[in-house]
């Protein structure tokens, strides 16, 4: 459903900042960096007050809003609860609705129901009823959602498109797309005006049912309504489904209409259109929109570069992708390996593993972080071409890359191929070192010992008995392949 969502103005505004601004310590600046969901924000709130610093309701509400936007729901709930319990803010139905929604996100609708039931009657209005409906819809509880919806209608609380949109989202999320248009029709019959989002949900439903004709009809309906202002997102959503349906000419028409409604400095909008043009294979349009985005958005964030690079790689425009990567390097943006890795993957896709390896080596030489997965990707490309010496070299590098708390397990096919090669070609010392590193990633297996035995036999076989004992200790049984390898020893 992400394609349907409205892009909030504050998300667009957040793309721009002044690097020379003097940072002032605020409650927001104290809470915002606490990204660990297991850590509580209560100590920061209490410490702020105990130090005699002022706290405003407006700032607290802004903090809750920001934390919700960043999906830090537990922290947002803690701030909201602290506001209420300390009396800093006397909750109106609006604050109760936000709090109820957060409870539903963190603890589920059962706990949200309890909060709702304990509210005074004066606070049970369209906002709090709507928040509880959100909780039911989010957890896809159809029975409770529809019963609650009917109760809201009985109480006269269904006077805007928001509630109907929730029910349409419910049907979308459970895959009952055929019911979405019926809700839209009911909305019109009840003289509740649909908004752009209502129509986008409906367009999405028709798209899921491969009904391009009704998508076109919905667009015409919107264009006729004086209370609807057509926006770029609606045309873009429709264009996506025309691309899916193979009607590329109509898709291009809709993309042009979408572009004409883009607001300046709307980088997210340009990014979305770039990805759709890439799906159509239209390199000129991708580059044209990228140039426009650079003109109107004076600062490009890493996500912008990622979007255009992924689009260029998708249409095999690697030369242009290299140029964009050069722009990114000189942009002053913080380093993000995903950006160069997009081009690296593009090289691999075009059997240019030497260039991919060279880029990784350049990054490592300049002290920039890479990932074992990227080195493994290059190693796999070499192995598939039979260039196993290069595959071995890349795998050694991959095993030496710091992965932190993440777990990385190289593919078994690649590991088996490299072990077989290094057993035949590498020194015993090389094999010992490689196997020791590999064991830390995937544990021990028979192929590791076969590589060690083969290498040792080539160097005289002085350690065979020790290796066989180690196999036994590791509970690895000698099989027919092991016996064949052992038979290659020279007789004493």
Curated annotation (Swiss-Prot):
Main location: mitochondrion
Gene Ontology terms: cellular component: mitochondrion
Transit peptide: 1-17
Ion transport among keywords: no
Gene3D superfamilies in UniProt: Tetratricopeptide repeat domain (1.25.40.10)
Annotated compartments: Mitochondrion
Keyword line: Mitochondrion, Repeat, Transit peptide
PPR repeats: 125-159, 160-194, 195-225, 231-261, 266-296, 301-335, 336-370, 371-405
GO molecular function annotation: mRNA binding
Similarity comment: family membership: Belongs to the PPR family. P subfamily.
PANTHER family, alphabetized: OS07G0598500 PROTEIN, OS12G0527900 PROTEIN
Stated name of the protein: Pentatricopeptide repeat-containing protein At4g21705, mitochondrial
Organism field: Arabidopsis thaliana
Lineage: Eukaryota, Viridiplantae, Streptophyta, Embryophyta, Tracheophyta
């Amino acid at each position: 459903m992400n394609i349907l969502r409205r892009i909030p103005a504050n998300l667009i505004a957040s793309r721009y900042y002044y690097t020379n601004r003097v940072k002032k310590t605020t409650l927001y600046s104290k809470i915002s960096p606490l990204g660990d969901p297991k850590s509580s924000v209560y100590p920061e709130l209490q410490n702020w007050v105990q130090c005699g610093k002022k706290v405003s309701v407006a700032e607290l509400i802004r903090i809750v809003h920001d934390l919700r936007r960043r999906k830090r729901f537990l922290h947002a709930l803690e701030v909201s609860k602290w506001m209420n319990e300390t009396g800093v803010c006397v909750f109106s139905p609006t604050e109760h609705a936000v709090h109820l929604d957060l409870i539903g996100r963190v603890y589920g609708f059962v706990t949200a129901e309890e909060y709702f039931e304990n509210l005074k009657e004066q606070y049970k209005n369209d906002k709090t009823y709507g928040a509880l409906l959100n909780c039911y819809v989010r957890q896809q509880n159809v029975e409770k959602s529809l019963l609650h919806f009917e109760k809201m209608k009985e109480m006269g609380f269904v006077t805007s498109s928001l509630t109907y949109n929730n029910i349409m989202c419910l049907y979308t999320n459970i895959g009952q797309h055929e019911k979405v248009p019926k809700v839209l029709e009911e909305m019109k019959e009840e003289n509740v005006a649909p908004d752009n989002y209502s129509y986008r949900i409906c367009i999405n439903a028709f798209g899921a049912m491969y009904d391009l004709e009704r998508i076109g009809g919905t667009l015409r309906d919107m264009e006729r309504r004086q209370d609807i202002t057509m926006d770029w997102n609606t045309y873009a959503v429709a264009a996506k489904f025309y691309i899916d349906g193979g009607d590329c000419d109509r898709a291009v028409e809709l993309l042009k209409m979408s572009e004409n409604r883009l607001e300046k400095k709307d980088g997210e909008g340009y990014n979305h259109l770039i990805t759709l043009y890439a799906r159509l294979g239209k390199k000129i349009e991708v580059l044209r929109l990228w140039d426009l985005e650079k003109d109107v958005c004076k600062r490009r964030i890493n996500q912008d570069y990622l979007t255009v690079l992924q689009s260029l790689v998708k249409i095999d425009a690697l030369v242009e992708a290299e140029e964009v990567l050069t722009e990114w390097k000189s942009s002053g943006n913080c380093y993000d390996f995903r950006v160069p890795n997009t081009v690296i993957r593009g090289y691999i896709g075009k059997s240019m593993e030497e260039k991919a390896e060279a880029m990784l080596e350049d990054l490592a030489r300049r002290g920039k972080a890479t990932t074992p997965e990227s080195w493994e990707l290059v190693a796999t490309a070499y192995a598939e071409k039979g260039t196993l010496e290069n595959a071995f070299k890349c795998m050694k590098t991959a095993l030496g890359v710091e992965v932190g708390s993440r777990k990385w397990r190289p593919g078994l096919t690649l590991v088996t191929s490299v072990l077989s090669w290094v057993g035949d070609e590498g020194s015993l010392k090389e094999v010992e070192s490689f196997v020791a590193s590999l064991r830390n990633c995937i544990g021990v297996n028979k192929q590791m010992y076969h590589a060690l035995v083969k290498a040792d036999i080539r160097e005289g076989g002085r350690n065979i008995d020790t290796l066989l004992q180690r196999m036994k200790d590791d509970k690895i049984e000698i099989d027919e392949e092991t016996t064949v390898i052992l038979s290659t020893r020279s007789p004493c």
